[in-house]
Amino acid sequence: SMSHLKCLQTAKEENLPYICIFEDDIIIPKPNKVKNQVNRILESGIEWDVLLLAGNAFLPHKVISDDYICVNKCFTTTAYIVKSSYYDTLIDNIKKGILLLIQTKNSSWTIDTNWFSLMRQDTFLLLNPPTIYQMEDYSDIEGKEVNYKDLMLSIDK
């Protein structure tokens, strides 16, 4: 959470129109497909606050186009783009989550679960079909080796 917070704060300080945040365990097997999807979304003029390039999405969600869905519940912060107009909202959400995570030690305050409330009220889009996923690795949150590939490449669960 803290590294994501720092990225957002830096983007705000630098007046960047967008920031794209990637975690270090990302796998992008089809980079040209992702680039084309993102370009089509940016050119479409659709309103969005956060564009998730990857995620572990759960139903219900709304299929908007062949390139993206609107999500209400999507785990992981593997890769995403945030518009400058949304920096303050996400910064506040992450700060609150960090404080409550430290105080309670409850994993429901981790960045990728704490922002569910934002997903329900604002516009979080996820690339569809998903092609990006996290490499198999040890999860500090789960305390074990995890492999999310199949979960992240499916939106119908």
PLM segments and residue spans:
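An acidic/histidine-cluster motif and surrounding catalytic segment
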Residues: S1-F22, I26-K157
